[in-house]
C-alpha cells in the first residue's frame, strides 16, 4: 500500500471517528495496521486503532450487560417464554463480541506484536491482547471461559514483565496495564486480594515518583491513578489500605477519557 493511501486511511479513520461511525473507523485502521510488516504504527495510528475497537466492542459489551440483567429478572419471575427469547438475542450479541475480539486479536498476533520495537509499543499491544481476551472471558462459559482467562493472564503478565523493567511507574501505559490487570483479577478470577494488592502497588509506586511526571503525560497518568483509587475504594473496606494522595495530585473526573471504558470496575483501554 502506498504511503499516500496509508495517510488517506488514517484521515478517513479520523473522519469516521468524528461521525461516530466506529465500524468504518475499524475498517480504515485495519487497512493501516496491515501495512506494518516492516514499519510499526505511529503512536497516533495505534491510538486510533484502539479507539475504534474500544467503541465497537464497548457498545456490544454494554448491550450484553443490559440483556443479561433482564434475563436474570425474567428468570426470577418464571417467564420461560421471555427467557428463551432473551437467550437467543444474547447469543446474537455474543457472536458479534466474539467476531470483534477475534478480529483485533488476529491483527495483534499477525501484524502488530511481531514488529513492535519499543517497550512502550510492546506493552501497549500485549495489554490490548489481554483486554480482548478478558472481554471474551466476560461472557464465555466452561472450557472456553477458562481458555480466555488463561490467555488474558499470559498476555497481561508478559506486558507486566516489560513494563516493570522498562517503563516508569508514572508512565500511563504501565498504569493502564496495572488498572486493567487488577480488574481481571477482581472480575474474572474473583481474587479481590490480588486485585487490591496490584492496584495499590501501582498507585503507591506512581505517587512516590509523581514529581517526575512531565506535563505531556500528567493528565493521563493522574486520571488512571484516580481510577485505581476508585477501584480500591470499591473493592475494599480495609482501613489499612492507604488511599491518601499527595497535595500535588489533583483528582480529575473519573469518567472515561477518549480511550477509556468504565464499568463496575474501571479499566483503561487506550493511549495509556
Curated annotation (Swiss-Prot):
<feature type="compositionally biased region" description="Polar residues">
    <location>
        <begin position="262"/>
        <end position="272"/>
    </location>
</feature>
<comment type="similarity">
    <text>Belongs to the 14-3-3 family.</text>
</comment>
<protein>
    <recommendedName>
        <fullName>14-3-3-like protein E</fullName>
    </recommendedName>
</protein>
<dbReference type="InterPro" id="IPR000308">
    <property type="entry name" value="14-3-3"/>
</dbReference>
<dbReference type="Pfam" id="PF00244">
    <property type="entry name" value="14-3-3"/>
</dbReference>
<dbReference type="InterPro" id="IPR036815">
    <property type="entry name" value="14-3-3_dom_sf"/>
</dbReference>
<dbReference type="InterPro" id="IPR023410">
    <property type="entry name" value="14-3-3_domain"/>
</dbReference>
<feature type="region of interest" description="Disordered">
    <location>
        <begin position="249"/>
        <end position="272"/>
    </location>
</feature>
<dbReference type="GO" id="GO:0008104">
    <property type="term" value="P:protein localization"/>
</dbReference>
<dbReference type="GO" id="GO:0007165">
    <property type="term" value="P:signal transduction"/>
</dbReference>
<dbReference type="InterPro" id="IPR023409">
    <property type="entry name" value="14-3-3_CS"/>
</dbReference>
<feature type="compositionally biased region" description="Low complexity">
    <location>
        <begin position="250"/>
        <end position="261"/>
    </location>
</feature>
<dbReference type="GO" id="GO:0005737">
    <property type="term" value="C:cytoplasm"/>
</dbReference>
